[in-house]
Structure formats: C-alpha cells, structure tokens
C-alpha cells in the first residue's frame, strides 16, 4: 500500500521493518509537520513539535528516576495529552507502558498493579484515593500534577538501541478463562495494525479523528491515536462517549474519522431524526459490530461515505478486514477477509482443519516477524495454551464460506457487553465472595439494542437462612468489581441445573432467560457507580 511517511522529499519507508519505531515516527512527523496539532482535548492541544519536546522532557525525567529498558510504567489516568506523551517517552527509553483500567478499584486494581510489577505508577488526581485505599504497594507513585513542567530536564534524552520487535506495552485483557492476561505488544504490532486503519479509512494529513474510548482500550490507539501519528493528522480525545453530544463534537472539531464499539452507534441510530443529521464532516468510520440492515440507512442519514469493520483482539489487531470500498459485495454478517501479513486456518479440537461451513477455532500464523503479539506477560501456561502446533489459537469459533469468514461463538464462556469482554468466571468469583452466596452462574442473554451484544444475567443460590436481596448483591458487586460487571438481571434460585459431574448447565439458564422472578436493575432504577 506504499507505507511511507514523507519527511520533506525524503520518505520514512515503513515497508522497512527497522523504521517501524514509534519514537522514530514521532521524530519525523515533528520535522515534517511541526505546527500541525497532534493531540487535542477539551482543555488543550499540542503540535507535533511540542509533543516531541514534551516526550524528550519526560524521557529525561524518567531516566533520572531510574527507568530503563524493559521497565514497566503503569498509567492510571484520564484521557489527556500527558497520557500519550508518557507512553511515547517510555517507548523512547525502551521501557513499557501499562494502561490500567480506570474502572478498577479494590482487589481488581491491586491485582493489576502487582501483576504488572511496575517501577513507577503515574496517576491522575481523580484516582489517587483508590491507590491510598490499597496501602503500601512498594512502587513509586507519581501524580500527574508532579510531572516536570516546561523548562526542567532540558538535557538531551538518552538514545538506547531499539528494535521494532521490542515490547512497548502490556494491555491487560480478561481473556477467555477469567484469568487476566497481559498482552505484550511491540512497535511493529501497533504500527502494522494502525496502517490497516489508515488504509481502510483513507486517513491523511489534514484529517481529524475522534477518540471516544478510554485509553486502556487498545482500539483507542490502533484506530485513532496511532493512525493520526502515522499520517500527521489530528486526534481529538474526549473523556467518554456521549450519544447526546457526539454529533456536536464531530461538527465542533471537524471530525473526519472515528471508531465506535458495541452499542454506541446503535444509540446514535436510535436517536430521533432531526433536520441536518447529514450536515457534518464525518467521512469514514469503523463501527463494530454494525448490523448489515442498518449500515446503508445509517450512511444515508448521516452523510457518511464509508463504514468499515475489522475483527481482531489485543493479541492480533485487524486480523480480518471488511473495507467499505463500494466495490466488494460483502455477504451478510461477513467479518471480512484476512490481512495480507497473516495466514489463518480454522481447526477442530484435534488440530485438524475443518471444511467449509463447519465451525472451527480461528488460528493464526504471521508471515513476517512481530505481526502477532510477543506473548502473555510472565504467564508460561497461557503462552503454552495459546501457541500450539505453530499456530496462535485465538479462542474464537468461526466458519468459512468461500473467502469470507463468519463469527460463531467463543470457545470459552465469555460475555460480550457494550464492547467489553466480561468473563463469567470472574463475575461469579466476585459474587461468591459474598458470605450469603453458595453458588453463582453468570451468562449473557441477547441485548435488545444489538444482537451481537449481551445483557449480563446472574443466577445465585443462597445459604439456607441468608437474608440477601438482589439489589444488595448488585451493590456488593459494584463495590468489588468494575461497574460494568454489575448484572442487569439477577435471580435468586433454589438450585442451578447441573450435569452428573456437577457442572452448571448454562445453556438451560440461557434458554430460560428472564422470568417473573428476575430482578431487573434497569426497571428498578438501579445504576452502577463508576
């Protein structure tokens, strides 16, 4: 696709693997587009040259505090310019940034920080109290209010030798088993994936992309921040998605590209129509998942040229691509076709390739080094399970029809909720920590907003003399897990359906669904606190 970034009349050729370094790309863009805005927020903005200066300052500061190659820096921060600068500064030193989910608190937060083994944690003031509640973690904690101001640390930053396959980040994902796994991504993993987003959306210098996702979500980087960096475009960061304010943000910031996940775009679609819906600069979007029945009408109503889709995971982003190029006649619900730099195969449980139309686990091989992630951080058992027979096993069940691929299910019991993967095992473990709960089964039932998404339902069995109602259990879960773990539906039952080997038969619970005895958080006006 001609992967080159112009530096004057000299291209930084990204077809050359050694050029695929995030710090090198920033340096070139700072010279090519010094005055172009790179990151813009509601409070401030920063140009490419200013970002390079800020990254240099933070690199010196980190180096002076003992941060070196392969050290980890946890970031518990709101979306802001400093967040992006700290990641680039860490990578310039060969260090590794670890975004921490800002919804985490209590033991979830403690576990993430302990497992990440950071040398430093940088925290926004909004979250300092959560760290204080955890007690001593034997890690340096720095408030964003204490970051070095302009005029300090102006010496030249160190320039360690970097390699395009070096790990630059660890993204914690719930995985498919309920045990959190740290996905190690390299410079190349990010850049090749961001180039896919650039290619699909036709992004270029002068464009503005809007990021509505939290920065602990890999999609924020691969679809918005890094594509802007690769093209010299501008990325607008907002704190959160707002269905009511989205189109005004698009108009105010001149947004030409964006990404929405889960039910976000369905909320936009279901909002009452108004005159001038199509009067906006948005040209290209990535909306996942977008029902085929809505795609065309959505484009017409809002005046959008193209709605692309991609299928992947933190381990291998943009694995399948579905480009809305006006030429390809995509079958309904097709996930797309494989990216050029990977080989894929659908295998059964014995490792044998399945035939057309038969569900098999999606497995991946890279055609060049460092296309896939670098493995799971300090997790040999997860790596052994994921990499077998020369293939990376994704855990996704797909079927193939000709050259097109279609999603079937997850091999493990995972709940898809508003663009997130919620482990049923993890939710059950939280519920079972309540002294009144003896058994718990969490599962997803089809969402009314989007068929590909779930509403979370939890069925529990209580101690014989326990006095616990559903709302109290919901509050307990809210206090001990991320807010999005709080089920919409809770039902207290006398017993759970079990197999002869005492395994819970969740398919029977799904088939049973919501009953007259089910507590509905939405109907009761219960709202989880973030």
Which sequence ranges carry the predicted segments?
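AMP-binding/adenylate-forming catalytic core of the ANL superfamily
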Residues: 104, 121, 312, 364-369, ...
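Gly/Ser/Thr-rich phosphate-binding loop
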Residues: 230, 255-260, 269-329, 343, ...
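Conserved AMP-binding A3 loop
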Residues: 47-49, 168-192
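Conserved pre-ATP/AMP-binding loop-to-beta segment of ANL
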Residues: 154-172, 179, 202-208
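Conserved AMP-binding/adenylate-forming core of the ANL superfamily
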Residues: 18, 27, 35-80, 84-88, ...
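Conserved AMP-binding/adenylation subdomain of ANL enzymes
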Residues: 191-208, 216-257, 271, 339
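AMP-binding/adenylate-forming catalytic domain of the ANL superfamily
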Residues: 481-503, 524-530
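Conserved ATP/PPi-binding loop(s) of AMP-dependent carboxylate-activating enzymes
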Residues: 341, 352-385, 422, 517
